[in-house]
Amino acid sequence: MREIDRMDPHNGAIRFLEFPEGDIACMVTSGGAALTALGQLMVLGGRPANAFDITAGPHEEKMYLATRAILERPGLRGLIAGGNVKNFTRVDLQVRGIVRALREAGIDARRFPVVLRFAGPGLEAARDIAASLPDLEFYEDDTSLEGAVRRIVERTREGASP
């Protein structure tokens, strides 16, 4: 992750921490939102595999590379990504990077659940990009971040069928 961050240290700084016992990849950003999501995930019985945050900026490539790096971890059972309403970051760029990495990794969202919850500039394009990957669940600001966390926990418990 450090190498990815060094690519352009002035554009979307990454903070990352792994949890050895976790099995749900977390790419929830926005500082406090990320911590809230991790706490909610644990309250609901999920096990976060990591903590992740990236500062505001146009960072499609960093999201792509970070998603690829996170997906390399063995034993993952699902992925949640998103954040609070973004005022500075185009969410379509974030979603494009994530979906590109998922597609290249050959992720089948029926077997490996993916839940995204984004809101902010570029939302319509983000929705279209997310819809291009079958069975990826995409939520907007009418769904709370806690609701999206609940959904990834449910999906990983269900054995990933939507």
Place the predicted regions along the sequence by residue.
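Charged helix-capping and loop-helix junction motifs
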Residues: 94-100
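Short, glycine-/small-residue-enriched flexible loop/hinge segments at domain edges that mediate gating
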Residues: 73-89
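ATP-dependent carboxylate/acyl-activation modules
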Residues: 1-78, 103-104, 119-121, 126-162
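A short helix->loop->beta-strand "cap" motif at the edges of active sites that frequently abuts
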Residues: 109-112
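Residues at alpha-helix caps and immediate loop-helix transition turns in enzyme cores, especially N-
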Residues: 90-94, 126
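Short beta-strand elements of ligand-binding domains
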Residues: 114-118
